[in-house]
Every structure is written in C-alpha cells, then in structure tokens.
C-alpha cells in the first residue's frame, strides 16, 4: 500500500529538476505493480529521467548488481553523482561503488546537505 509523500521533499526534487545540469534518476525497491500504481498517483515521479525498479530487475537494494544496472543503463559516473537513500546500508553500498552519498533523515537535513554541496 502506498502512503502520502513529504511535500518538502517534492519541492527539493522540483528545485533540482529545474537545474539544467542535473539529471535525476531513481533506484527503488518497489515491485513492478507498486511502481506502476505509484506512477499514476505521484506525478512528481515524472521528474526523473529514468528509474530502475527492483521488481523489474528481480534484484533488490542493497545488492550491488542493482546499482550496477543503474550505472550501466544511464551511463553514470559514480564519482560525479550523488546517491541519496533513507537506508544506511544502501548508502554504504553506493559509497563502495564510488558515489558521493547522502543518508536521508529528513527533508530539512537533505536540503542542508544539498546546500553544503552547492546544489540548492
């Protein structure tokens, strides 16, 4: 079952989307069915240029193979990319793969971290 969403997080997403040089990509552990329902419920998901869905790939985070699918599919250079996730192990795997990372705790904390990086 899908719940609500944090409007401040959506505002951050919209702000990043408006920045010309930022390509937003997603990596989710949703099932295929949940993702398709979410796409209908949450129009802000259209701000992502692409999303890798674990249900489609039959692999879940924190399996590094799922991250590699994201990297390969979208030609990501991890050292020039920021990975944001609310689960610590997922952030640690991304760090191991060379990503800059932010462990999401709250919308305010995320905004502060992005400001420190000069992204907001």
What are these regions (language model features)?
Residues 35-42:
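Distinct, well-ordered alpha-helical segments
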Residues 46-50, 78-81:
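Short acidic capping loops at alpha-helix termini that bridge into adjacent secondary structure
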Residues 30-33, 57-58, 88-89:
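Short, solvent-exposed loop/turn segments at secondary-structure junctions
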Residues 60-88:
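Conserved Lys-Pro-Asp/Glu-containing loop-to-beta segment of HAD-superfamily phosphomonoesterases
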Residues 1-25, 64, 107:
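Short, acidic loop-to-helix structural element flanking the phosphoryl-transfer center
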Residues 78-114:
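Acidic, Mg2+-coordinating phosphoryl-transfer loop and its flanking beta/alpha structural elements
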Residues 50-58:
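His/Asp/Glu-enriched short active-site or ligand-binding loop at hydrolase and phosphoryl-transfer sites
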